[in-house]
């Protein structure tokens, strides 16, 4: 998976012979003006690309910042899963704020304009963010797998989650050091190196051709293929537990909490508004937990699927380029450029997609997003939520009766 800030490795003005391109001194200024006017100035479709990058930049920064604020401001949202979601959002903010602008300029100008130091720093941070995202998604899947499939084997806590997050960043910062070590900035036109940074490229430089093949093969397996395969297996088992069979202990709870409809009707006649009996209440709580776990699992599976789809093109292109040596003498250069450019944009689009997924699939995050935008859209503010809660409280009596009746009817059906 190539760091998306280094597409400038494909030179803008390659020479057919591979020899340095020399210009007479009198023509340097005129040549630079020609390059800017007819070659580097964004074309029409590149303006579309710029607009797409700007949209992703704004959505990713605002959305992921709101995710972090939602968990920070609300103690009831400080769950283990949400701690990992915040960590994923922090990685998305990092890559969006630092790497996205550089990647956009490189894709448009096909030149590295930021010098040698940032040539090492930006690709390194890009690789670190990829590692953090993959490890975070892996820990989320592992936590859900233990909680749902093997709840008695491991007890996840917020303290352990925070320790895991620190470990994720430490491992990612350490294992991606080789990415920074091999990045070098060089100029395709040495004669113009002192006049402009146009057509400078930031690319990997290895001592032997075998090393990049080994490194990028391992990178693809460790940061994409293997973790996604393991996470797919984990979510498959989670899916079976939540939708195919009962959570461990639910069947016994079903029998234990069951009350006959006649007993339930007798309890209802004792008052105008009676709360569900303790056993029925316990079962209702268990059903509510089941529904909440299903919603959370559904949201996390969508996040994982979107991540896999967004990172698939750049992963495949990087393996083809670095391992199999393709695209060096591409006959259709524009098509190759378009593929790499679109794949770079998809990486950043994933950062913008996550907050959107949370908004549509998580009621708690959706309420917090509405509250955050209440200053601009009063109808979406806390007032509407308060009115909704008031109506809910007024109808709690009737809802509780209906819920208990539905539960007991379901129990009767299951046990008959």
Curated annotation (Swiss-Prot):
SMART domains: 7TM_GPCR_Srsx. Disulfide bonds join 119-202. Keywords: Cell membrane, Disulfide bond, G-protein coupled receptor, Glycoprotein, Membrane, Receptor, Transducer, Transmembrane, Transmembrane helix. Residues 1-22 are annotated as: Disordered. One of its GO terms (biological process) is regulation of cytosolic calcium ion concentration. The chain crosses the membrane at residues 47-67, 83-105, 120-140, 161-182, 214-235, 299-321, 337-360. Glycans are attached at residue 194. Widely expressed. The N-terminal region is required for orexin signaling. This is Orexin/Hypocretin receptor type 1.
């Amino acid at each position: 998976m190539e760091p998306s800030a280094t597409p400038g490795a494909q030179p803008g003005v390659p020479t057919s012979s591979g020899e340095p391109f020399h210009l007479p001194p009198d023509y340097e200024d005129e040549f630079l003006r020609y390059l800017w006017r007819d070659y580097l100035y964004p074309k029409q479709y590149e303006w579309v690309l710029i607009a797409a990058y700007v949209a992703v930049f704004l959505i990713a920064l605002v959305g992921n910042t709101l995710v972090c604020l939602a968990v920070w401001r609300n103690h009831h949202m400080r769950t283990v899963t949400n701690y990992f979601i915040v960590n994923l959002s922090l990685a998305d903010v990092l890559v969006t704020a630092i790497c996205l602008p550089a990647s956009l300029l490189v894709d448009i100008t096909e030149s590295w304009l930021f010098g040698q130091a940032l040539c090492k720093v930006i690709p390194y941070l890009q690789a670190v963010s990829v590692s953090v995202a993959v490890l975070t998604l892996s820990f989320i899947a592992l936590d859900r797998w233990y909680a749902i499939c093997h709840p008695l084997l491991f007890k996840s806590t917020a303290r352990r989650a925070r320790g895991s997050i620190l470990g994720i960043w430490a491992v990612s910062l350490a294992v991606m050091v080789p990415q920074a070590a091999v990045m070098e900035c060089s100029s395709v036109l040495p004669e113009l190196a002192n006049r402009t940074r146009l057509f400078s490229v930031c690319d990997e430089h290895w001592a032997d051709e075998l090393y990049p093949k080994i490194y990028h093969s391992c990178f693809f397996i460790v940061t994409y293929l293997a973790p996604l395969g393991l996470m797919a297996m984990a979510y498959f088992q989670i899916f079976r537990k939540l939708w195919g069979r009962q959570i461990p202990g639910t069947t016994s709870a079903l029998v234990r909490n069951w009350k006959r409809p006649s007993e339930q009707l007798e309890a209802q006649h004792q008052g105008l508004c009676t709360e569900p009996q303790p056993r029925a209440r316990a079962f209702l709580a268990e059903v509510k937990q089941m529904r909440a776990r299903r919603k959370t699992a559904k949201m996390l599976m969508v996040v994982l699927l979107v991540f896999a789809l967004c990172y698939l093109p750049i992963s495949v292109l990087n393996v083809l380029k670095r391992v199999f040596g393709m695209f060096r003498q591409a006959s259709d250069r524009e098509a190759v450029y378009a593929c790499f450019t679109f794949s770079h944009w998809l990486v950043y689009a994933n950062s913008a997609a996550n907050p959107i997924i949370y908004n549509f699939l998580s009621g708690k995050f959706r309420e917090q997003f509405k509250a955050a935008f209440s200053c601009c859209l009063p109808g979406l503010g806390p007032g509407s939520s308060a009115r909704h809660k008031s109506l809910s409280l007024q109808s709690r009596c009737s809802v509780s009766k209906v819920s208990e009746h539905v539960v007991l009817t379901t129990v009767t059906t299951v046990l008959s």
